[in-house]
Amino acid sequence: MPSPMPAGAGEVREALSAAGRLGPYFAISTDPAEDADPTWRPLPERDPERLAGLTALYAERLGTGERRVAASILFQGLASRLWSPVVAAAALGVVPDLSGLHWRWAPGAPVALWLAEPRGHRAGGTAEAADLVHDQVVTGQLEPLRATMPTFTSLADGLLWGNAASALAGGLNVGPRDGARTALVRELLSRPPLAGTGTLGPHGFTRRNCCLYYRVPPGGEMCGDCGLRRPPRRGEPSPQGRP
């Protein structure tokens, strides 16, 4: 199989700029001036103390004393921020290289992302795009994050990868219908470790397990894709829970 063609910095910036127009969860800054800001941290995040501290902040915001609930939501939020811009850019034919990715978090705002050295590859079709995205997001980012989680909390692998799948599919709820994005998401959901975590159907994605958000006091809602909800009946809109 031939190696994917490299994409120039200008192509990567253009694809990420287009992705960012879908909303804040799709934004990755490529501004070189951000290099002067010492609050950026490299990704993947492997510091258990840092992640444990963020989990505690999430727990405080959610009003829960259950560390694993907050850790689950933290993982899903980070997965969403990683999938959303990369999949949107890949649907335009360019997959960014995330080896220079940095992150910054402030309460009440989406995780901010900055790519220090914009580079990447051109994707010639859905299968090639899925190969590249899987390598960048799953292998390069989510697997190291998943490996760090057990150092400060207890969450099953199936739950974490269900969260990752939910975050991936949830990106399709933002912006206009896009056949290329949908095909790419469907292809990624068919590959390990996401394969078997849920089903992408005409009403959207339904996962086979639960992110634990329903345990947030005083009685958190079930998410719209939760495996604990019944499927919608014919002609009925999809259930609405936490986005």
What are these regions (language model features)?
Residues 1-67:
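Generic N-terminal leader/targeting and pre-domain segments
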Residues 39-202:
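Hydrophobic, aromatic-lined core segments that form the binding pocket/scaffold
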